[in-house]
UniProtKB/Swiss-Prot annotation:
InterPro entries: Rbsml_eL15_core_dom_sf (IPR024794), Ribosomal_eL15 (IPR000439), Ribosomal_eL15_CS (IPR020925), Ribosomal_uL23/eL15/eS24_sf (IPR012678). One of its GO terms (molecular function) is structural constituent of ribosome. The gene is RPL15B. Belongs to the eukaryotic ribosomal protein eL15 family. Coiled coil: none annotated. It comes from Arabidopsis thaliana. Residues 171-192 have a biased composition (Basic residues). Transmembrane segments: none annotated. The keyword Ribonucleoprotein applies. This is Large ribosomal subunit protein eL15y. Pfam families: Ribosomal_L15e (PF00827).
């Protein structure tokens, strides 16, 4: 068994005494640092490698802190216009996951880099922590690598803002395949619009 197998087994048993203590200490450390921090190497090397990370030039890892809880509607003094049924301010549920929010924040802050993937790292009562894998599309080590140079194409700018990363596709309901997922393609909204708009052909 290789070393990564042991590491992944450790992370599978998060409730073990070792991992509980380690995660608690790390959480305290993360709270003292800024919300977006560059790391020297990934905290979970086995997970990072599975998601596309390589320990070579052009690849970087950032840790992002996201506040837990629901999303409050950003209205001044709670003044919402419209019908009473739509006047909620609190108890609204954001339609995307915290992980996709973390990817978005990293992508906005680091505009010259491209988001490859991300994974869960830690959480406490107030925050969730994720590590984001990014690559530099201008670096020759990335441009000359046939396994990753697809991301250098301009069409992949800000994938995380358009729901094109793994987590973004999951939030859009595009993870599944087959006849059970016909109503998710090309998107849930497009299918709804097609099914709810009347198209009457002209009689000639």
């Amino acid at each position: 068994m290789g070393a990564y197998k042991y590491v992944s087994e450790l992370w599978r048993k998060k409730q073990s005494d070792v991992m509980r203590f380690l995660q608690r200490v790390r959480c305290w450390e993360y709270r003292q640092q800024p919300s977006i921090v560059r790391l020297v190497r990934p905290t979970r090397p086995d997970k990072a490698r599975r998601l596309g990370y390589k320990a070579k030039q052009g690849f970087v890892v950032y840790r992002v802190r996201v506040r837990r809880g629901g999303r409050k509607r950003p209205v001044p003094k709670g003044i919402v216009y419209g019908k009473p049924t739509n006047q909620g301010v609190t108890q609204l549920k954001f339609q995307r996951s915290k992980r996709s929010v973390a990817e978005e924040r990293a992508g906005r802050k680091l505009g010259g880099l491209r988001v490859v993937n991300s994974y869960w790292l830690n959480e406490d009562s107030t925050y969730k922590y994720y590590e984001i894998i990014l690559v530099d599309p201008a670096h020759n080590a990335v441009r000359n690598d046939p396994r990753i140079n697809w991301i250098c194409n301009p069409v992949h700018k800000h994938r995380e803002l358009r729901g094109l990363t793994s987590e973004g596709k999951k939030n859009r309901g595009l993870r599944g395949k087959g006849h059970n997922n016909h109503k998710n393609r090309p998107s849930r909204r497009a299918t709804w619009k097609k099914n709810n708009s009347i198209s009457l052909r002209r009689y000639r």
